[in-house]
């Protein structure tokens, strides 16, 4: 029964994710349209917005993980480097029924781990040396199972797309606000009260939309973390391992 409820929650989350991504795309294009309107060519603004969303999404979808790993100077791990880490991830992959992700490590004292990629066939799990050094075997297995669940549940793809689209919304909103500094809205002064009201509505949306988008993103991310905890516990059959690991991570960060 618990397993069925978990699968139902994951399916429900995936449906909500699709709706949220579509909503973010519509918002980004709507803001682009309004930006074009300020410069008296709403259609061009919409076309530019569509191209911008497509380009940024493609870059993030196909290169986002490599950019993140490169930014953190992550090094790929082999069995020769850390046999237990590799063997544990291979075992969890079999239990989850997905291909074994690539494994990376970052020389960083702060205990952390994350999964990246666009799908289970193109995924990786990264841990810091700080995490590797303070975790015992059960705790490490719990953390890795949590990250494996993010891969299996396609959280990695969703969060990458949402992060990109939220970034696009922030950028377009910033362009809208800056356009008034550049004088882009001056030509609408002659359009009377209706034009002024529309511009005020647009400015309000440009200010509030990025904030709302980030809040929605954080709320959705938190829900996915809960589901990854539950899915990870199902993989290891040992929820205490992850609970102890999270306590260690929290204590380590409190000391910083």
Segments and roles (model prediction):
Residues 205:
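S-adenosyl-L-methionine-dependent methyltransferase catalytic core, i.e., the SAM/SAH-binding region
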